[in-house]
């Protein structure tokens, strides 16, 4: 059997024609465990929906989050969904995200939707204003929070959060929806470090592959804006 010994991701890539990934270095988040971190989270009542954006070149991505406190007053992080665009500019992609949000959460008050990103999305370039600046104008009127989100401290914060045990309320502190396949693949190793080479010091820096890193950067932006403050100033 030609498939013997292959991982599910490799089978998906070779047989099903899906993107998939072939591990080419240690995962950025080795503490991610499918049985503990994948489930069916929903958006709790009276909780803002966080859309975290990464405007990757020709591959923009957005992830949908909820950050909420349980009856034990502990912070929880639910990763509800994600979208990406292939060979599409930021503005048409954003219009699709806005339309999808209305379909997926039809009763959600628009005032309960918050948008976050990295400061790079606001930079003016030779082609004009950054997408964050454009989307702040009519007809979109998105109110972005954005700041410089360095990779290493963000990755470290997420790693530490993934290591937390099940909460005293009985629920996982972090849960990603099982339908968000590319995000799960990213956590499992699609988003990875460079492979170590004998005799050479390899900097612990996530690989930029133009696919998984865009999804995972958006997740890091969401955490920087809405998780870090909860950890610094708990309850």
How does the language model describe each region?
Residues 1-53, 58:
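ATPase catalytic-site recognition across NTP-hydrolyzing enzymes
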Residues 66-72:
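Short acidic-glycine loop/turn motifs at beta-strand connectors
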Residues 210-211:
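C-terminal helical/tail subdomains of lipid-metabolizing enzymes
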Residues 60-66, 220:
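Short beta-strand scaffold segments in enzyme catalytic cores
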């Amino acid at each position: 059997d030609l498939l013997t010994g292959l991982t599910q991701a490799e089978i998906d890539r070779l047989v099903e024609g899906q993107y998939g990934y072939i591990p080419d270095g240690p995962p950025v988040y080795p503490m991610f465990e499918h049985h503990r971190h994948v489930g069916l989270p929903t958006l709790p009542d009276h909780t803002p929906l966080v859309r975290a954006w990464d405007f990757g070149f020709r591959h923009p991505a957005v992830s949908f989050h909820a950050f909420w406190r349980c009856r034990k007053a502990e912070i929880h992080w639910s990763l509800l969904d994600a979208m990406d665009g292939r060979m599409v500019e930021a503005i048409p992609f954003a219009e699709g995200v806005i339309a999808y949000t209305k379909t997926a959460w039809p009763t959600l008050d628009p005032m309960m939707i918050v948008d976050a990103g990295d400061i790079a999305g606001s930079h003016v370039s030779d082609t004009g204003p950054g997408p964050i600046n454009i989307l702040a104008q009519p007809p979109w009127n998105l109110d972005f929070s954005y700041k410089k989100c360095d990779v290493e401290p963000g990755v470290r914060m997420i790693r530490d959060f993934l290591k937390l045990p099940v909460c005293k309320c009985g629920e996982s502190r972090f849960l990603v929806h099982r339908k968000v396949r590319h995000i799960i693949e990213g956590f499992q190793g699609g988003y990875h470090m460079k492979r170590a080479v004998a005799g050479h010091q390899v900097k612990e820096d996530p690989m930029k592959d133009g696919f998984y890193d865009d999804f995972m950067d958006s997740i890091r932006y969401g955490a920087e804006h809405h998780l870090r403050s909860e950890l610094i100033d708990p309850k």
